[in-house]
Amino acid sequence: MSYNTWHDYGYGICTDDLKEEISLVKLMKLVQTAPKLYEKVKKFIDEDCDGQIMETYDLFDTYVEEYGEVNYGGLAEILYEVIKEVENIELLVSTDFNGKEYLIYPPIYPWTLEKMSDKEKNLTEKDLVEIFSKYLHIVTNEELTVEYQSIENGG
């Protein structure tokens, strides 16, 4: 049996660096900024949770693992889906060896530009910091440093 490692690189945040627990009310405010995601989450709540959701854990784990686009990542996954829908920017959710979750904007190859929105083609570092801040401030008052990340994992 072999063991492989991989690295993800990009500019972004480690959502596990947040110290305060995210409240369900704030998390739902974040989800509501993306109408299609909100409908998916609402369907999950109605069908899988009998119309009630009691903890952020239900969304971070159960929803993300069963219905999320990347199926892991907790808050990073929710932010990924919101930003993808609202801002039309494709980010990457990644997890390191220690289970820490990241949301990053990876380096882009020139031949992928034809698939990008005009907004993404003209994205600046400042724009990216503002986007992360905009959506993080819906769920927390904490500041996360947006910086270059090197994420290593394996399996």
Residue positions per predicted region:
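Acidic (Asp/Glu-rich) sequence patches and key acidic residues
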Residues: M1-V139, G155
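C-terminal or internal capping secondary-structure element at the end of a domain, subdomain, or sheet
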Residues: N141-G155
